[in-house]
Structures are given as structure tokens and as C-alpha cells.
């Protein structure tokens, strides 16, 4: 009923948006920068905090331990974990993931933490093993 009263507007992701209005965050340069460097993401220097919060809320950007990743980087990390587990079914180490991702421990640990928390991997002592949501390699 509200949209009838407001005329040319639709509800998208819980927000009222005028029809024909471009999404100002659709092609945000920070998301592009994160996607261009998936495993060594840049810091959000100069990114408006409100825009950053909205990008995280929408799922375009994932924050883990203060590091921001493109959603596509998380998917890529899950595929990398699957490939590592194809080679080492008993589990892979943090070091193996870090070397395969070409990044540092600073960026590896938040990625692995996210994969563990979403069921892609599970931590067993010093290795990561397949979780129930591990994708195909």
C-alpha cells in the first residue's frame, strides 16, 4: 500500500528506491579494487564509512577481522581450499594456503577464519579439512 501512495518506487533489499534511479553503489570503485586483488585487498582508505557499511550490509564486501574482501574473493578462496584439499585430503596448513594464495599471514588468517565460520572448511589441530559447504574444485 505504501508503494501505491508513493507512486513510481519499488522496494529493493528493504529500501524504497525510485524507479529509474541508478544504484550509486552498483559499481563502487572500492569493490572493483578488492576484486582486482582478491587475496591481498587494499585498505578502505578514503572510502566513506557509510558507503562501506552499506557495501558490507548488502554482501558486496565481506569484513573479517578488520580486513575487507570482495564477495568474489571469498568464493575464490573457497575454490582454492577445495583444490588444496584435492591434493591433500587429510588437510592443508595455513602455510600451504598462504603460498597458494600468494599473500601474507595477515590476509590468510581472516580468509581461513571466514571459511571455517561458514562451513567451507573446518579447523582440525594445525590443518583445515573439508567442511559441509566445500565447493567443487
What are these regions (language model features)?
Residues 1-137:
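C-terminal non-catalytic scaffold/interaction domains in large multidomain proteins
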Amino acid at each position: 500500500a505504501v508503494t501505491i501512495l508513493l507512486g513510481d518506487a519499488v522496494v529493493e533489499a528493504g529500501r524504497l528506491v525510485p524507479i529509474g534511479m541508478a544504484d550509486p553503489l552498483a559499481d563502487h570503485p572500492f569493490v572493483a579494487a578488492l576484486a582486482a586483488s582478491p587475496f591481498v585487498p587494499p585498505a578502505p582508505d578514503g572510502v566513506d564509512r557509510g558507503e562501506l557499511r552499506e557495501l558490507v550490509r548488502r554482501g558486496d564486501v565481506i569484513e573479517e577481522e578488520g580486513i575487507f574482501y570482495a564477495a568474489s574473493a571469498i568464493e575464490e578462496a573457497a575454490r582454492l581450499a577445495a583444490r588444496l584439499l584435492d591434493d591433500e585430503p587429510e588437510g592443508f596448513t595455513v602455510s600451504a594456503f598462504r603460498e597458494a594464495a600468494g599473500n601474507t599471514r595477515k590476509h590468510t588468517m581472516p580468509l581461513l577464519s571466514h571459511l571455517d565460520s561458514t562451513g567451507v572448511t573446518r579447523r582440525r589441530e594445525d590443518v583445515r579439512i573439508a567442511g559441509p559447504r566445500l565447493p567443487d574444485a
